[in-house]
Amino acid sequence: AGVGGALGGQYLSGQGPVLVLNGDLISSVDVTALVVQHEATGAKATLSLWEVEDPSRFGVCDLDESGMIGRFQEKPEPGTEFSNLINAGCYLIERDVLSNLSSDKHSMEREVFPGLAEAGGMSGLAFTGYFVDAGTPDSFIEAAQVCIANGRYDSGRVEGDSWFGEDSN
């Protein structure tokens, strides 16, 4: 159904903003800092942002000095990007934005984020540390290496640059 369809308001209960994490990434984003930024700006959505050399695989954000995102463009053609700051796949979004979405297929990045940014309702928080989008075979291996290097596993053992599950030989 796309991320937007899966987040459609009919599936949500509770109060306050919704934390969304893309399932194919590893990062060191500080969610508490993201919440503080979201509350301080009063934004409808607050995105974690990461700087990359080639942003063509990602959504690109134009962040101003007050922490607001003025433009959002999903997967720009190489050479057309206006920034190297990308959506790092962890964001807070207000429930009223989601309540307007149906369960049909929606792309948050193509249908929701650009309008929120243009309307002045989107903030961003750039972070440092590590970020790996594990959407390709090579980046999946890189993500595993980042997890090993940063102790991001809760079972098994590490030998050299390899991780082994609890019952593996």
What are these regions (language model features)?
Residues 88-93:
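Short glycine- and hydrophobic/aromatic-rich loop-to-beta-strand nucleating segment
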Residues 13, 55-56, 64, 83-85, ...:
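A generic fold-level signal
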Residues 23, 94-95:
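Residues immediately flanking
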Residues 63-81:
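Short, flexible, basic/aromatic active-site loop/helix in glycosyltransferases
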Residues 33, 40-41, 66-68, 95-169:
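Left-handed beta-helix
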Residues 1-65, 101-102:
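Conserved beta-loop-beta/alpha segment of the NTase-like Rossmann-fold superfamily
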Residues 1, 80, 128-132:
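Glycine-rich "substrate-gating" loop/helix at the edge of Rossmann-like oxidoreductase active sites
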Residues 49-50, 73-77, 162, 168:
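Short, well-ordered turn and helix-capping elements at secondary-structure junctions
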